[in-house]
């Protein structure tokens, strides 16, 4: 678990340094968080942003996640949501509500 936390914290720090301080939370969910992953499992990560974001912002964040993929030889499957979206129907989708409820926070 400590390796996963190291990766999560490094990802959060990297995004805050290279994207902006609008990154509120990084949450690991899915098989990596629940202990039923294998060597081919990706890292499902929910990135909660303080502000709204554009497609350009999304692409920038995905590029930064790719840097972390290379650094750790993993695959990050990033999902973005803003704090504002958490209060909408998008935020109530099971993928997001489960991640927030039972995921591992950086």
Each PLM stretch: what is its role?
Residues 31:
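P-loop (Walker A) phosphate-binding loop of NTP-binding proteins
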Residues 1-25, 34-39, 49-106:
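Catalytic core of pol beta-like nucleotidyltransferases
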């Amino acid at each position: 678990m400590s390796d996963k936390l190291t990766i999560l914290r490094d990802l959060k720090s990297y995004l805050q340094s290279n994207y902006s301080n609008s990154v509120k939370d990084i949450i690991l969910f899915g098989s990596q968080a629940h202990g039923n992953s294998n060597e081919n499992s990706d890292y499902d990560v929910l990135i909660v942003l303080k502000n709204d974001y554009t497609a350009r912002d999304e692409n920038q964040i995905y590029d930064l996640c790719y840097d972390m993929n290379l650094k750790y030889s993993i695959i990050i499957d990033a999902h973005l949501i803003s704090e504002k979206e958490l209060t909408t129907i998008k935020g109530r989708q099971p993928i997001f509500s489960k991640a927030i409820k039972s995921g591992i926070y950086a």
